[in-house]
Amino acid sequence: MKTNLLDFNLDQLTQHFAEMGEKPFRAKQVMRWMHQMAEDDFDAMTDLAKSLRAKLHERAEVRVPSLMTGQASSDGTRKWLLDVGTGNGVETVFIPEDDRGTLCVSSQVGCALECTFCSTGRQGFNRNLSTAEIIGQLWWANKAMGVTPKNERVVSNVVMMGMGEPLANFDNVVSAMQIMLDDHGYGLSRRRVTLSTSGLVPQMDRLREECPVALAVSLHAPNDAIRDVIVPINKKYPLSELMAACRRYLEKAPRDFITFEYVMLDGVNDRPEHARQLLELVRDVPCKFNLIPFNPFPNSGYDRSSNNAIRIFREILQEQGYVVTVRKTRGDDIDAACGQLAGQVQDKTRRQAKWTQIIEDRKS
C-alpha cells in the first residue's frame, strides 16, 4: 500500500524522505507543492528530479478525501461533505467575512461526547480522522476556491470546531495543525488557528506544551449541575478543574485570553442569574464570551433563547467589562451553522438508535 504523504508534518516528511535516501530540502519542496499549490500529481512537481518523481509514484501518493456533495448558502457560506470511506462522510464549512475567511474543520467521524444540544453528538461516533483527512479539508477548500501562492489567501483562519472533539484525537489533530502553521505548509499564525474543546483537561495541558494555538472552550453552563446534563464530560472534568486548566493554558497561549463559547438554550442556561453565576465562575480567567443562539435541528428538545433574553444576558456580562460577541448565525439554510454539522456517520455506539427511541417515547 502506498504511503499518503498528507499524513506527515514537515519533521515526519523529512524523516520519510531520509529513509528513501533523499535530502531534507526535498521534503520542503514536496510540502510546498502539496499544501501551497494544492497539487496531488507528482509529475506536476517540476522542480523535483525525474528519478525522485518516479520513486514517489512507486511508493507514495497524495490522497485527500473525495467530494460527496457541496452546498452554497445564500450568505456565501460553503459546505462540503467529504468521503472518508466505509460509508462515512465529514463536513467542513467555509465562512467568508469582510476581513477574513474562516474554515471550520472536523476532527472525528461523529463525536463520542454526547453534548445534548449538538446534532453531531446525536449521530454517534465511528472513528478518529487521520492527519491526511483533517488537513485534507483545508487542502480541498483551497483547491475548490482556486488558491495558489500568487492569489490572495482565501482561508485566513482555521477553527477546529467541526464534527468531533479535537483533543480526543490529539496526535492527528496536532500534526495537522503543525502543517497549518508551517511556513512550507499553510503559514498560518498561532493566533489564526483556534481549537475548541469541551474540556478534556489532561489534553489541554499537553496542547499547551506541544502546540499552543488559540483556545476556545465549549462552556455552555455556569455551574456543574447544568453542565453535567448538557455537556456530560463535565462529570469527569468538573468546572473547577476546567478553569484551572484554562489558567495554566494561558501561560503559553498565543492570545492572552480564553474564548468561552456559550450556546443559549431557552429556559436552561439563559437567565440573568445564570449570567451572574458565569461571572463568578470565570473571575480569575482572562476571557471573552461568544454567545451562540441555539440552531434548532429535528427533535432536539431545545428552543433558541429569545433575542431579549440574549440581550439581557450579554449586557450583564458587558457591564463587568467583558468583551461579548453574539455569533451571527451563518449557513443555517444548508445546516452549516454551529451545532448542525452531522455528516454521514456509521455509528458504532448505537447512539442514533438510543435517540430514536427517546424521541419515540416523547411522542407516545
From Swiss-Prot:
The residues listed in the UniProt record as binding S-adenosyl-L-methionine, with positions renumbered to this chain, are 164-165, 196, 218-220, 295
The residues responsible for catalysis, as annotated, are 91 (proton acceptor), 338 (s-methylcysteine intermediate)
> MF terms per GO, please?
4 iron, 4 sulfur cluster binding; metal ion binding; rRNA (adenine(2503)-C2-)-methyltransferase activity; rRNA binding; tRNA (adenine(37)-C2)-methyltransferase activity; tRNA binding
Known Pfam families for this protein?
A: Radical_SAM (PF04055), RlmN_N (PF21016)
How the cofactor is bound: the record states: Binds 1 [4Fe-4S] cluster. The cluster is coordinated with 3 cysteines and an exchangeable S-adenosyl-L-methionine.
UniProt KW keywords:
4Fe-4S, Cytoplasm, Disulfide bond, Iron, Iron-sulfur, Metal-binding, Methyltransferase, rRNA processing, S-adenosyl-L-methionine, Transferase, tRNA processing
Q: What are the annotated disulfide bridges? A: 104-338
Q: What InterPro entries does the entry give? A: Aldolase_TIM, Methyltransferase_A, RlmN_N, RNA_MTrfase_RlmN, rRNA_lsu_MTrfase_RlmN/Cfr, rSAM
Q: Which domain of life is it from?
A: Bacteria
Cellular component terms per the entry's GO annotation? cytoplasm
- Identify the PROSITE patterns for this entry: RADICAL_SAM (PS51918)
Q: Which residues form a coiled coil?
A: none
- The EC designation for this entry is 2.1.1.192
Q: Which cofactors does the annotated protein need, by name?
A: [4Fe-4S] cluster
Q: Where in the cell is it found?
A: Cytoplasm
Q: What is this protein called?
A: Dual-specificity RNA methyltransferase RlmN
What organism is listed for this UniProt entry? Chromobacterium violaceum (strain ATCC 12472 / DSM 30191 / JCM 1249 / CCUG 213 / NBRC 12614 / NCIMB 9131 / NCTC 9757 / MK)
